[in-house]
């Protein structure tokens, strides 16, 4: 495999097939200027999983070069319809599914496609395409070729909705986007929608059972002022969300979205300034790029509530009362929105006081007894509201090199939550 020399950056790039083993590559030919020597010689074996330095000397002059191996990759990395609707990519089966509203004319949709560097794609990106039937896309890059089948599914009346501040799913932060992608792939007849779309009535929610909002913000969201400053789009959609709730729709609020029951008037003490308007009173969070590394499984407690739907079929650990959610080396921001319980501070001396004042039912607890999972039961014609504010509830790890076991409980618990809320 010949190297391509870039003199401007003093880089040599050796392209190899996608499946080629680059752990020990032999230098079979190295041509230098007359009189020059190098610390890398023909016959040397190089570990090309990382770039290698080459020091070349000629008399009093020397230059450092970098040699790197680049595998021929032919992948579609993102597929977006009309600048809004993101496709879910199944890399194993080379399929892409895009869910769009029924109102779109699928005979003329424009996909924007991101694919591997140096590759070509056919049909081309940004060309109006008829998606009445599945469309095949072929990506080619030197020795690598991949063929993807793209299917567009129209949804007239979604059964479930993931809402967010962003106008399209690809603009969500990576934590939110990971959660949303899971929903689109695992909850039937589901869609992503922005709060603006909800506010404008762009979607027919007459058959929607559940609206989910998983709200992440680096550094945390603590208190009513901080929440309202961080999520003005959500507040603008309150009238429509209240109507949805009154007509029997249910909510799943996770992480900092657990402040929403106060804004919607679902929490009974939503007007009590001294009780933080019924919002979680103990909130914090880290930054995704500097996320903490788990030394082992993290967990919260479900003591007394193991029979609740949300806790069924979980991956079990040593403690029967624990819900384990992370694995060793998982990176987590520990983004938390919980209720501190105690006579020392926070306004809720005990669980009975919290229940009476908020109208909530506590379902999960932190190590210090804080309430980290709770629900507000249906009243009259309204739906139910389920909240998860535990810092252990986390979808994305910046480090993917961990062995997943307990983290599977995040998806299991969320699927259980949908089943619980959709079958009230």
Where are these regions (language model features)?
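Catalytic beta-strand/loop cores that center a nucleophilic Ser/Cys/Thr
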Residues: 287-390
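C-terminal alpha-helix
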Residues: 416-424
